[in-house]
Every structure is written in structure tokens, then in C-alpha cells.
């Protein structure tokens, strides 16, 4: 029998439906993290570089702290970073070195899946 897995997009993309481009803040995410961890998702599509920039610009929150806190609150479920090519928190193309550094930081702070 074929195995079916589910990837949840609530905190990365789905939240924009109700809260506009600024999305959920860290406290809102942490409030649902334990339930999401128990739900049995293959992964939670957690963030993008744009999502991280929005956390800083509009919510005045640290996206790295958000990632670490969510990881601690949902330790069993993989967290995904949706990459948009060769850019990170900018519309400008980033160097390979910067992207490698950004990906290392993401892994070190709790991301374990890239899409």
C-alpha cells in the first residue's frame, strides 16, 4: 500500500489568509506548536526568507528566536524552509557563500527540511 504523508503550511502560508501579509506572530505560533507536533505531519512548512524578513519589519520579532522556540515546542516534526532560489531576506541575488551560510544557520537553529 502506498504511504501518504501530510505537509502542513499553516504557519508559513496559510496564516496569510486571516492575518494578511504580516501573518502569525511568535506567540500565536507557539500556541499551536504542541498540537501540530502531535498531529503526525511529515513536516511543517515553517518559513521562507521573505517570511523571516516580515517578522523583523512588521512584527519586530527575531525570526531566529521564533525558529528555535517553535523547534523546542514541536520536537518530533520536521520543520521546512521553502527556498526561493539564490536570495535570502532580499530581492537581490545572493552569493553562493551567503546562501551556504544562511542554510547552515537555518539547520543550526532547527530547520531539517528544505523545499
Language-model regions, residue ranges each:
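N-terminal amphipathic alpha-helix/helix-capping segment at the start of soluble metabolic enzymes
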Residues: 1-19, 67-72
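Structural preference for beta-strand elements that scaffold enzyme active sites
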Residues: 3-6, 14-16, 43-45, 76-82, ...
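Glycine-rich, aromatic-flanked loop segments that form ligand/cofactor-binding clefts
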Residues: 4, 65-95
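Active-site mouth loops of central-metabolism enzymes
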Residues: 10-31, 82-99, 108, 113
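Glycine-rich, proline-tolerant flexible connector loops at the mouths of alpha/beta enzymes
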Residues: 20, 42-67, 85-91, 115
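Catalytic domains of carbohydrate-active enzymes, especially glycoside hydrolases
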Residues: 28-50, 105-111
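Acidic (Asp/Glu)-rich catalytic clusters
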Residues: 37-38, 67-76, 103-108
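Charged helix-capping and loop-helix junction motifs
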Residues: 60-64, 96-101
Amino acid at each position: 500500500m502506498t504511504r501518504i504523508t501530510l505537509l502542513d503550511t499553516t504557519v508559513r502560508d496559510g496564516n496569510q489568509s486571516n492575518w494578511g501579509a504580516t501573518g502569525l506572530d511568535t506567540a500565536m505560533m507557539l500556541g499551536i506548536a504542541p498540537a501540530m507536533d502531535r498531529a503526525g505531519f511529515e513536516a511543517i512548512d515553517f518559513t521562507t526568507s521573505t517570511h523571516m524578513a516580515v517578522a523583523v519589519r512588521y512584527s519586530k520579532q527575531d525570526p531566529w528566536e521564533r525558529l528555535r522556540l517553535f523547534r523546542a515546542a514541536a520536537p518530533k516534526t520536521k520543520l521546512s524552509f521553502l527556498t526561493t532560489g539564490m536570495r535570502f531576506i532580499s530581492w537581490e541575488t545572493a552569493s553562493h557563500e551567503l546562501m551556504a551560510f544562511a542554510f547552515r544557520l537555518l539547520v543550526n537553529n532547527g530547520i531539517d527540511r528544505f523545499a
